[in-house]
């Protein structure tokens, strides 16, 4: 019985130690969430403004034959996959990687995030770059460099489509793994936008098509950076939720173990009293 009580006591200490770690990780994730949410909110207007500008240019010259708008048979796809740099975030990494794995055909992968790079290296996928890009540390400048490489490869015909898999930040409790097509652009101006473009006095120099092509790398950079911001915020929210659940589970386990310990202690005391009484009677 004494050995059993000792084992329970050791297990309680082990769970308490784990609970301290999960609680600390929950607090760290919570402290980083505010800045991550601000990055998400600040990145969205930039992307929306660029998309609006591209739509206006497309509406002003609907006959333009821009390669970024042209749709042809997709023989090869560049897949940008954003995952986390660490684990212990519930199903965050597994969900986005599972979604990316559903992409079939001739695919080249640009992984962002340590877990994404490890996953596709393990599966021997053809990689766009051998550099490991950490999602939490990637800068706006790096996104612009990637965007120029992506648009240059698309323009040269190295791939016919660019898709992006990331985790959209809906709320602290909800994050959704999504896949979007970045290139070619699915841009169909409405009749109202076309009418407004005809009435506007905007002149694009040297031409609307060249201005459109010049903005595309900025647009792709904005999409990638925005997706990184959303993914990082989603990872922190998922980790906070997972660590909160782990902390609560650890607390419940400690309560159960304390109950078992007290019962074992009570049984040991009762046994000792019984033995003393039996010895006195003899």
Where is each model-derived feature located?
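C-terminal beta-strand-loop-alpha-helix "lid" module of Rossmann-like NAD(P)-dependent dehydrogenases
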Residues: 1-282
């Amino acid at each position: 019985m004494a050995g059993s009580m000792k084992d329970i006591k050791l297990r309680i200490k082990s769970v308490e130690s784990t609970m301290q770690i999960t609680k600390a990780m929950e607090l760290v994730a919570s402290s980083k969430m505010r800045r991550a949410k601000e990055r998400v909110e600040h990145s969205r207007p930039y992307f929306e403004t660029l998309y609006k500008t591209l739509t206006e240019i497309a509406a002003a010259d609907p006959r333009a034959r821009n390669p970024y708008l042209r749709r042809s048979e997709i023989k090869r796809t560049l897949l940008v996959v954003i995952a986390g740099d660490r684990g212990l975030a519930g199903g965050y990494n597994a969900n986005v990687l599972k979604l990316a794995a559903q992409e079939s055909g001739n695919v080249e992968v640009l992984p962002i995030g340590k877990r994404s790079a490890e996953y596709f290296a393990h599966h021997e996928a053809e990689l766009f770059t051998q550099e490991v890009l950490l999602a939490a540390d990637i800068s706006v400048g790096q996104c612009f460099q990637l965007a120029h490489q992506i648009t240059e490869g698309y323009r040269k015909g190295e791939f016919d489509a660019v898709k992006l898999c990331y985790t959209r930040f809906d709320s602290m409790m909800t994050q959704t793994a999504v896949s979007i097509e970045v290139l070619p652009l699915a841009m169909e101006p409405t009749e109202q936008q076309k009418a407004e473009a005809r009435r506007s006095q905007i002149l694009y120099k040297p031409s609307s098509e060249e201005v459109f092509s010049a903005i595309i790398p900025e647009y792709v950079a904005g999409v990638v950076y925005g997706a990184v911001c959303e993914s990082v915020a989603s990872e922190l929210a998922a980790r906070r939720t997972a660590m909160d659940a782990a902390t609560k589970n650890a607390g419940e386990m400690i309560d159960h173990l304390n109950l078992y310990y007290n019962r074992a202690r009570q049984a040991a005391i009762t046994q000792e009293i019984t033995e003393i009484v039996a010895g006195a009677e003899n």
